[in-house]
Amino acid sequence: MVAPIPAKRGRKPAVATAPATGQVQSLTRGLKLLEWIAESNGSVALTELAQQAGLPNSTTHRLLTTMQQQGFVRQVGELGHWAIGAHAFMVGSSFLQSRNLLAIVHPILRNLMEESGETVNMAVLDQSDHEAIIIDQVQCTHLMRMSAPIGGKFPMHASGAGKAFLAQLSEEQVTKLLHRKGLHAYTHATLVSPVHLKEDLAQTRKRGYSFDDEEHALGLRCLAACIFDEHREPFAAISISGPISRITDDRVTEFGAMVIKAAKEVTLAYGGMR
């Protein structure tokens, strides 16, 4: 009765250790790929990453796809090169430090707040959860104002920044996203019909800015426009948010022009193209 006990205890570490070793190796390889992409200061081809890692293309692609699903990397351009993803912001600053994005953006946000008199936000796209994440904000001085924490998330279909991102996607991409996420109703004004949402996105593309008309919170309006990188890919958006009593119907176009101008300024300063 005594002999089997040590044998059972001796086998357990071996069973647990083998998978752990493989998992650690995959994690190490994935992190090294992430570092090489960050050091490229732009984007890099799959074959080049595989060569640097000393791995087959298939293994490298599997690791990259896993990180892409979590939003840490993204594919850009017609050649499908790999670049740092926005979700890296959630665990580190690689995405922002690559070109001191916040240092570029914040003065423009402050100028936009002073010009509009309303709270101004900057958001990036979380590709894993398909939500807009606020990474910077300049609040207005009004007692009644929009207030959301840095790191706060907003739904794609019911927010200014989210709809600005959606408007840059193809109809097929939008349809896939809607099937995956659904269209939750936050207020009576939320666009819960795919047809109505797609019509709204068409208007967004035509105007150059999105318009959240009490679709996420009653009494709150928001207008947003995208910022583009050097691959003409949208990766962030600037928005103006305020109560319907100040963002009135007759001023919507005026605020829209302001946010378009600010987004273009950031795109240019960042070295992006539209």
What are the functions of these language-model segments?
Residues 2-3, 9-13, 138-216:
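Short, solvent-exposed recognition segments
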Residues 2-96, 102-103, 110, 264, ...:
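N-terminal helix-turn-helix
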Residues 23-27, 46, 81, 85, ...:
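Short, structured helix-loop boundary elements
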Residues 73-75, 122, 227:
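A structural signal for short hydrophobic beta-strand segments in well-ordered beta-sheet cores
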Residues 78-79, 83-180:
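Amphipathic alpha-helical effector-binding/dimerization core
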Residues 173-176, 182, 263-274:
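Cysteine/selenocysteine-centered motifs that mediate thiol-based redox chemistry or coordinate metal-sulfur cofactors
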Residues 189-263:
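Extended hydrophobic
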